């Protein structure tokens, strides 16, 4: 976390000095796991949540990651019924992450949404969310249980280019025969899927677990409901998502 604090404090220096071919990744709200996931000598990490004027950092972004966190305020997707089902809100963060998504989308910046970040990806694109999964779709699959749980997800898309942005797949691929065991810690999820968002994988209750934006619209916008940053540094999904993200950033 030390590097993030330094970069936040010295933002004026970053904007005025040559970055020496380093690339800048903006995290919507940083934590140690996210920093460790993407930390490299040629990467500058900025914690947007600790910047008072986020407009001042947008043009620095070579990549943007929306991280996990609180529930998104339901009025952002025109839902008043969900308010009573939600936990805590962070209105400033809602606005910040909507702005970061819009900037990434409009400027073709490589983008990852994790957990809440994938939900914001859908909401910002015009989709909606389930307010509380056990209440609305049942508890056949536990998505959290006093903390993080593990469960299987199944790849449901057959476009190998889309799938490989997130999952480590090689050679001949058969949809609905590819399973991954992932971590889970959420009580909300994607309901109405926004236009241009393609579901790549689902849990057994049909909840979207991985998505991409149509590559005809944006070259690299991906989202996952699970937490790749906490899967372990040698986990194939942890590595694949990071490497594909870096490939786009360093093109």
Description of each model-found segment:
Residues 6-10:
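Hydrophobic helical h-region of N-terminal Sec-dependent signal peptides
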Residues 222-226:
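Active-site-proximal beta-strand elements of phosphoester/diester hydrolases
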Residues 119:
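Cytosolic ligand/metal-binding cores
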Residues 2-5, 15-114, 122-130, 134-181, ...:
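N-terminal beta1-alpha1 cap of cysteine-dependent amidohydrolase-like domains
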């Amino acid at each position: 976390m030390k590097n993030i604090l330094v970069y936040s404090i010295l933002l004026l220096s970053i904007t005025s000095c040559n970055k020496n071919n380093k690339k800048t990744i903006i995290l919507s709200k940083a934590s140690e796991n996210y920093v460790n996931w993407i930390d490299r000598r040629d990467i500058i990490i900025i914690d947007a949540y600790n910047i008072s004027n986020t407009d001042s950092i947008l043009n620095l972004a070579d990549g943007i990651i929306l991280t996990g966190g609180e529930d998104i305020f339901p009025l952002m997707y025109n839902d008043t019924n969900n308010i009573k089902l939600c936990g805590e809100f962070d209105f400033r963060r809602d606005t910040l992450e909507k702005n970061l998504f819009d900037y990434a989308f409009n400027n073709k910046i490589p983008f990852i949404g994790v957990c809440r970040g994938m939900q914001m990806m859908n909401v910002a694109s015009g989709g909606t969310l389930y307010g509380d999964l056990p209440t609305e779709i049942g508890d056949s699959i536990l998505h959290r249980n006093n903390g993080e749980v593990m469960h299987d997800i199944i790849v449901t898309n057959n476009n190998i280019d889309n799938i490989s942005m997130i999952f480590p797949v090689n050679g001949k691929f058969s949809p609905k025969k590819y399973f991954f065991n992932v971590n889970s810690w959420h009580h909300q999820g994607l309901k109405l899927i926004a236009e241009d968002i393609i579901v790549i994988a689902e849990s057994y209750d049909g909840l979207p677990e991985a998505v991409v934006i149509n590559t005809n619209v944006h070259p690299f916008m991906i989202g996952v409901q699970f937490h790749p940053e906490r899967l372990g540094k040698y986990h194939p999904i942890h590595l694949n998502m990071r490497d594909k993200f870096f490939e786009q950033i360093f093109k």
